[in-house]
């Protein structure tokens, strides 16, 4: 991680000359923040995503709460914070000193969850600073982040069927994903995923009608289904019809269980299940379908239940998203307990590039799988693609192979693989 090894000596060529933020729209038509950072030698632009189902322990995304603009979701306060408070403190600093800049912004905020300046303000600047540094050094972002060790392409875990908060159907589980882990290259993996996606669309239209191919926030189909097994059967059918086997393409679930947890019970498939019953339910699914990973299978504070499922399904990837919120303190607790065995890394959950790297490093040191992730409300920003390669993430989760804000990330990974040439290595799970 080149930008994290000590402080760089001052050089006027790399000093921040100007920072400018603006309000733009995300993929759900809501405002978000975009930040430009200028140096004499380079330029960086970054825009910040937003989640639909969010963990209560995430860093705070600052919204205006003005009902007369965008239903209260404007971000002009966050924009102003960047253009005044943050810019004033960062002008003249060396963009190569990422950690120094991130820590200064965190100190300026003076809260645990970045609620004064806003995690969206801080993250927008943090990402734009990194991009400006890479551009100033005439270096690809993945190489700037990861140095000579950045050559691994992650397995895409593609959300092709949507439920929960990402769709308007009755499926409790939020995401049903395909994982082309048997591919030889990322290029091939993307082709496999796209082929299955289109076969699935035809299957759904034939069985459920044309409206079943309407898509959710992340590009996945949102058919009128009510039970998880119905969705899983459709995925298995599509994988087979596309000409692939269960060893080549596995299935991932994002339960987002906090969203269907109520008064110590989980409402799923028309049933009200206690945690031990839900655990048995997941075990049955894994025994019946080629499921490789389950994300957020329980309520976000249920560390003990995560631990129990991780022990029960020891060869399944149990992912902590709302459980960990990319926070090293919560991740440390999970590691100590053996709760989950994978980290979902979302930079906007924690609010800075440096802290995201810290979480990824802790996860990897402790044998956890790292999955870099988008959010449901995205932009065309591709920073997470470079980040995934830089940290050697085993997987990347950035939606279906559809919708421009999703394919932007996949297409960036294709470019990186091409740039790496023969040294590129596609992860083998």
Curated annotation (Swiss-Prot):
Positions annotated to bind (2R)-2-phosphoglycerate: 174, 346, 375-376, 397
Residues annotated as binding Mg(2+): 254, 295, 321
Where this protein primarily resides, as one coarse class? cytoplasm
What pathway does the UniProt record associate with this protein?
Carbohydrate degradation; glycolysis; pyruvate from D-glyceraldehyde 3-phosphate: step 4/5
Kindly give the HAMAP family that the UniProt entry links to this protein: Enolase
Pfam families recorded for this chain? Enolase_C, Enolase_N
Q: Which PROSITE patterns does the annotation name? A: ENOLASE (PS00164)
What keywords is this UniProt entry annotated with?
Cytoplasm, Glycolysis, Lyase, Magnesium, Metal-binding, Secreted
Q: Respond yes or no to whether keyword Cytoplasm is given for this record.
A: yes
Cofactor requirement: Mg(2+)
Kindly state a single biological-process term from the GO annotations of this entry. Answer: glycolytic process
Its protein name is Enolase
Highest taxon listed in the record's lineage? Archaea
Active site location: 218, 346
Catalyzed chemical reaction(s): (2R)-2-phosphoglycerate = phosphoenolpyruvate + H2O
Q: What is its EC number?
A: 4.2.1.11
